Amino acid sequence: MTEKLKIIQWYTGEIARHQIRVIADCPSMELVGAYVHHEEKNGVDAGEIAGIEPLGVRATNDLDEILALDADCVLYNPPTERYDEIIPILESGKNVISIIAGWNPKKRSCYPAILRACEAGQSSLYGTGLNPGLSYELALLGSSICTDVESIYIKTCEPQATLSEVFLQMFGFGKTEE
């Protein structure tokens, strides 16, 4: 039997809880850690956080503790890009898969630091674009070329206060028809 892929779940919101359940059900993966930011989740079993049976993986908010774990990959689910967290993860030799679509470090001043972190840790960073979901972005993008939109109904279950100004401008939030 091949070795299981060792996963750390970073953040434990709605999408992450689903990811934890998928990992628990997948015979080729093993959850080895869970990083939380809310004190009330610190020390709680990751399975319980995800609404399933305990997995024997205690969530922590201790950065040094989580980075010391032996893991192949970190599933990173922040509300926005957080380079101050990504750099130490990459330096520790863990590959990062993120639900953030906006990772484009070449266009950011932190690109050299990200590149150095990946080289030092022999790691990689991949943004999948699931945060908070592609479907609403497509509806908004499609409507941007229309001259007569009668209705678009989009429901999101996630606070949007942390969206970047670039994102808001890209989709025309707060603008008039002109």
Language model features by range: what are they?
Residues 95-97:
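A short hydrophobic/small-residue beta-strand
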Residues 99-102, 129:
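Short beta->alpha connector loops at strand-helix junctions that form conserved
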Residues 130, 135-178:
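Conserved anion/nucleotide-ligand pocket segment
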Residues 1-92:
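N-terminal glycine-/serine-/threonine-rich beta1-alpha1-beta2 phosphate-ribose binding loop
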Residues 61, 127-129:
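Short loop/edge segments at beta-strand edges and connector loops
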Residues 48-53, 113-117, 143-146, 169-172:
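Short, hinge-like loop/turn segments at secondary-structure boundaries
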Residues 101-124:
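Rossmann-fold NAD(P)-binding glycine/threonine-rich loop
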